[in-house]
């Protein structure tokens, strides 16, 4: 790793008509870290990552990936650089078997160049690679689950399928939009070590999350947004101790509840 942030967001603003959803937000993401982004509903979290990933065009500002200006680049160009994401509302190909959901991204130019996740620069049989990835993120290889239609999967498996589709292209950054939402406590308990393992494998993660306890476990640096503006950036301990954050986001009772289980 070098000292330059892998991703730099500079003074990004996004306005929808007269409504400013994101207002001059700047942040640096260090290679290999897990950066958490939190804030109340409507605070601009998803809009910010939509700007980063090219899903919407920002009003002003700059975004750099490994020092290269990627401002205004289309979604497929940004994905080809290795910046991938999951969605709060999951978007699998519901009519296809799970493993076929991975075969499609394995046809991408990036997957062909890199060999896909664990590919070592050479892409093998796509069906086999798909099953290998699914097994690694928690699908039982010898069960029927990888071959089931995505439409039949419960939420826990769909969340893992979202991550698997990101891994298929051997990403450098995965942006997770509420990966813990809708999961049972046991599903969350098994998802946390998976996130930690992805970081150990060298992937940089940006996590938008409402499940604070779990986020604070995996992330050492948190950014708080409110009304489209950055409130504070710091460690989980600094975030929970900040009086302004308590007022605008948590409420003192919620902070105390999270702290008591930290």
Enumerate the language-model features and the residues they cover:
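The feature captures the beta-strand-to-loop junction immediately N-terminal to the Walker
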Residues: 38-40
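Helix-to-loop junction immediately C-terminal to a conserved catalytic motif
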Residues: 53
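Conserved catalytic motifs of ABC-family nucleotide-binding domains
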Residues: 170
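Catalytic Walker B motif of ABC-type/P-loop ATPase nucleotide-binding domains
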Residues: 174-177
């Amino acid at each position: 790793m070098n000292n330059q942030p892998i991703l730099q967001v500079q003074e990004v603003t996004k306005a929808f008509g007269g409504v400013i959803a994101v207002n001059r937000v700047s942040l640096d993401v260090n290679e290999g870290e897990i950066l958490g982004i939190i804030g109340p509903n409507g605070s601009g979290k998803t809009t910010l990552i939509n700007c980063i990933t090219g899903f919407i065009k920002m009003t002003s500002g700059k975004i750099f990936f490994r020092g290269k200006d990627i401002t205004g680049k289309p979604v497929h160009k940004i994905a080809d650089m290795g910046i991938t994401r999951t969605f709060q509302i999951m978007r699998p190909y519901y009519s296809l078997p799970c493993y076929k959901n991975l075969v499609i991204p394995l046809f991408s130019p990036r997957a062909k160049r890199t060999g896909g996740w664990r590919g070592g620069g050479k892409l093998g049989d796509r069906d086999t690679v798909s099953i290998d990835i699914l097994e690694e993120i928690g699908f039982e290889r010898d069960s029927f689950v990888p071959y089931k239609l995505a439409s039949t999967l419960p939420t826990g498996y769909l969340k893992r399928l979202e991550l698997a589709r990101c891994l298929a292209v051997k990403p450098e950054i995965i942006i997770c939009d509420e990966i813990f939402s809708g999961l049972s406590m046991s599903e969350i308990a098994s998802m946390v070590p998976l996130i930690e393992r992805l970081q150990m494998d060298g992937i940089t993660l940006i996590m938008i999350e409402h499940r604070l306890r779990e986020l604070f476990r995996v992330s050492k640096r948190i950014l708080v947004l409110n009304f489209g503006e950055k409130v504070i950036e710091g460690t989980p301990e600094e975030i929970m101790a900040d009086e302004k954050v308590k007022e605008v986001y948590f409420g003192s009772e919620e902070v105390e509840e999270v702290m008591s289980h930290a």
